[in-house]
Amino acid sequence: MKTISLAIIALMLCVQLTKAQSRILPIDTTVTTKHKLQTNKEIINYTATIGTQPVWNEIGDPIASLHYTYYTRDNIDNRADRPLVISFNGGPGSGSVWMHLAYTGPRVLNIDDEGFPTQPYGVKNNPYSILDVADIVYVNPVNTGYSRTIPAFGKEVDRSKFFGVNADIAYLA
């Protein structure tokens, strides 16, 4: 009897954990903040905008929420002449986090030469960021980072719309 009771409790916990994993995300939001970056050459003032953008189906219903981070260098006279880098890793499984926090972003993980975290843990200025020469958008494909499909009326979205080279081109273009 004790084993059955424990099994029932374990099952109930699993159901609750599954419910905790399903979250409702707003489909169109932004948050903007201002920052400074010390590079090897100069101090760069920049704006960071993170947000989500809806992906629409053929009849105009939102079917996914696409997460992005957008960095723009401040005090640029003609933004139309400034290069824009759009960076994303392939999903599912890996969002743009490694491009963002390991290579081109204005802040990088505090790690040693072999890639192990060093104290104090966290992030530090990236003196090699490309923000001095180009604005950057990091995009998380659907089911990576905070990008998710949006089930409508209890029905799951057709996942074939998001997984594959041609699918990525279709919904990201």
Language-model features: locations:
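Conserved acidic catalytic loop of the alpha/beta-hydrolase fold
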Residues: 155, 170-173
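N-terminal cap/lid subdomain of alpha/beta-hydrolase-fold enzymes
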Residues: 60-163
